[in-house]
């Protein structure tokens, strides 16, 4: 199996050799075959319009990379529009709730958000070094000191505090970028979110070569600026098959500057997750089919997760990656069905 580094290099190389060129007539099939390691039956599955996902080899057990692809008889612009449509995303498999933040985020943007009762129970015994809910150390102290744990309306109070803390964390990121994302100290090895994100994006080693604006934006926000980027924030409550998880995400939609050689990409950068993910980045590119109208949605989901090492962790990892693979297939198929529900006007 190819390593995740080579997978993502070849993945982004597709953007440098669009299928509209003569030398790109075999793309993305050559990429599927030589880089992802798909056999002809698997490639045929994708060409026939079915979604396919595959777990990609990673360098360490706590890193998880999943590749997925599906052919869609629609235009890439329709996908970019869908990726920015919160109402449409809410209907995709796995979503419990999802809401956009205002351009200037405010507390009311988090109306409707509530922690699971199990999470609230686990917060009662949460302490630095051991906490079932993923929180930076300073947030753990604030939770412990700010609440009357015997109050009859405890769930309400916890959720009000959680909303205020989530809003402040987002505002801090909008001002200070990755360094404001904090450090998780509820593990034996403290994890700085900025460092773990850098380690994941490093695997996308061709990204700074072929999409330098997008790469810089992901690493250097808010200092980085680009006319080719549309960005926004949302929160989501999702079920990955284990515990329901609350996440704050920055969505970055990228359109290449050259009309003759367009590049379409969507990056979803996790800023916070209540469970599992220390950091995560989903990168999707749209590659037009050389032989027929339509395009391929090709996604690589990369994350760094706690609790996946050791004997117990290896068992958890097997379950987690299998659920991630099957979930990606379901989501890609749902996206395809939605995009193809309107007639294709031409690419």
Place the predicted regions along the sequence by residue:
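Positively charged n-region of N-terminal signal peptides that target proteins for export
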Residues: 1-5
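Terminal "cap-and-tail" regions of soluble proteins that handle hydrophobic small molecules
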Residues: 23-72, 76-78, 88-89, 93-347
């Amino acid at each position: 199996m190819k390593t995740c580094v080579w997978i993502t290099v070849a993945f982004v190389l597709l953007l440098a050799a669009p299928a509209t060129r003569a030398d790109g007539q075999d793309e993305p099939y050559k990429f599927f075959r030589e880089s992802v390691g798909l056999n002809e039956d698997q490639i045929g599955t994708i060409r026939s319009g079915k979604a396919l996902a595959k777990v990609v080899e990673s360098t360490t057990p706590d890193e998880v990379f999943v590749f997925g692809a599906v052919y869609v008889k629609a235009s890439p612009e329709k996908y970019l529009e869908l990726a920015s449509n919160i109402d449409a995303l809410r209907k995709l498999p796995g979503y419990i709730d999802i809401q956009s933040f205002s351009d200037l985020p405010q507390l009311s943007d988090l109306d409707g958000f509530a922690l699971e009762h199990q999470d609230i129970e686990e917060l009662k015994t949460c302490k630095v070094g051991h906490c079932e809910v993923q929180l930076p150390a300073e947030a753990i102290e604030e939770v412990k000191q700010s609440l009357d744990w015997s109050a009859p309306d405890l769930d309400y109070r916890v959720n009000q505090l959680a909303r205020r803390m989530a809003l402040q964390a987002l505002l801090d990121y909008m001002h200070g970028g990755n360094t404001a994302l904090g450090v998780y100290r509820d593990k034996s090895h403290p994890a700085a979110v900025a460092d773990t994100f850098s380690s994941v994006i490093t695997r996308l080693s061709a990204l700074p070569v072929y999409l330098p604006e997008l790469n810089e934006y992901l690493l250097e926000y808010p200092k980085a600026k680009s006319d080719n980027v549309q960005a926004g924030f949302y929160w989501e409550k999702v079920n990955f098959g284990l515990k329901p998880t609350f996440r704050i995400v920055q969505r970055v939609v990228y359109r290449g500057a050259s009309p003759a050689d367009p590049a379409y990409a969507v990056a979803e950068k996790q800023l916070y997750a209540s469970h599992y993910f220390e950091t995560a980045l989903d990168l999707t590119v749209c590659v037009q089919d050389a032989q027929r109208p339509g395009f391929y949605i090709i996604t690589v989901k990369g994350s760094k997760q706690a609790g996946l090492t050791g004997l117990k962790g290896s068992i958890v990892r097997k379950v987690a990656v299998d659920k991630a693979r099957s979930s990606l297939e379901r989501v890609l198929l749902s996206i395809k069905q939605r995009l193809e529900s309107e007639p294709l006007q031409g690419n």
